[in-house]
Amino acid sequence: MDYKPAMAHSSPNIVICGAGIAGVAAAYALTVDHGVDNVVMVEPGIPLSLTSDKSTEAYRNWWPGPDRAMTAFMDRSIDLIEDIARATDNRINLNRRGYVFATSDAGKIPFLRDMAKMAEARGGGAARFHDTPSSLYTPSPEHGFDFAFTGADVFTDTSLIRRYFPYLSPTTVAVAHARRAGWLSAQQLGAVMLEAVRARGVKIVKGRVVGIDAGTRVRAVEVARDGERLMLAADHVVLAGGPMQSEMARMIGLDLPITAERHFKVSFPDTLGGLPRSAPMLIWLDEQHLPWSEEERAALAEDEEARWLFGTFPAGVHGRPDGASATIILYNHHGDAVDPVFPLPEQEHYAEIALRGMSTMVPALQAYGGKPTRPYIDGGYYMRTRENRPLIGPVPVEGAYISCAYSGFGIMASRAGGELIARHITGTELPDYADAFLLSRYQDAEYRAMLENWGDDGQL
């Protein structure tokens, strides 16, 4: 990809604390989109390696909430990601296979219908309902992203479900296929942006942020590097610390309303072809008891510490095919707030729980007997606010900005999040959704009241 330099102009020193996807996207928007120079990123490790590469790499514009802010924000981010895909001959392997939400509970049919109608009202595209065997439906293509359909298709005719999604559990009674959704290579998206910012002269200082010189405004960032302390002059500081964001924010006297939730994913070679290579992202909406054989149940019953595996597991197990033969599954069945620590503690039985949970939705995966072949587990932390909306923009300390709380949607939101930070810093026109992501929203009494009745926060 050839990066045409934007019109450069004299600009203040900008230090971005963190070179995960949020920090790199901010640097990209500042330098490539706005022509800003004098940008430095500070990162203690390898850029994009702490948690940015530990996701399902998926995206969607299907978001609940009391207004259209998240849908508009994600639509903008997807637009910008598609621009990168077009400019690089789709080096980032972007597809638009969609997200399929499925249930075996007829009581959830009104929920799926309402979600589709709400998404339509929020600007997410038309809701289409398929209640008879003759209803017309156009499947999403396996490859590419220039696909006209948006919105969602809601199926309640089981013969149609069997025709178009034959791999789903025969107990499935309803499906919603959100269409402006799919996945990409997060590694390649990050690499494209990182290459571009380096070409624009952005320097990456390897070190740990240990202090920020700020009274009423920021002046410098203190970095510990190779046993020495380095002071980086700064007129603007962007805190994009991912799991370390709370620690960084306290350096300027901020106590951010964010918590950390641990998440994992398992990838394994699907040698038995349990999940078809053409499948979309699949999400099971029902609570469940994991499927165990009688022999397994008897063995587990004898182990007091393993009896919790007989309990009720939450809705939300989801997975997708990955490349020619692998399958990825996420099942975040423990959502408690924790303090981020690295390396990530191991989660007992995770691969088996995830595979068994997913096999409830896709019975062909039961062929593995709950034992995936050569499973690879990684994970990270979802840094999130109570209502699961990000924090993007200026804070009370002049010259300081935050780009954080991207929860499980950091990859898909990265381009719009970076653009929003760049617009705040450069003083250019802000989009309508900008106020929805400011830290100052929590000072608004009406917003605080809305938090008490927020409803679905959209986290998978």
Task: Label each PLM-derived region with a short phrase.
Residues 6-22, 40:
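Beta1/beta-strand and adjacent pyrophosphate-binding region of the FAD-binding site
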Residues 31-53:
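Glycine-rich FAD pyrophosphate-binding loop
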Residues 57-160, 164, 314-317:
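Dinucleotide-binding Rossmann-like beta1-alpha1 core, especially the glycine-rich loop
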Residues 72-75, 102-109, 176-195, 343-352, ...:
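Short beta-strand to alpha-helix junction loop
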Residues 147-163, 337, 348-415, 419-425, ...:
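Flavin (FAD/FMN) cofactor-binding core of flavoprotein oxidoreductases
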Residues 169-171, 175-236, 240-243:
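Helical element adjacent to the flavin cofactor pocket in flavoenzyme catalytic cores
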Residues 227-299:
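Central helical "cap/lid" subdomain
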Residues 271-398:
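Active-site lid/adjacent beta-loop-alpha segment flanking the redox-cofactor pocket in flavoenzymes
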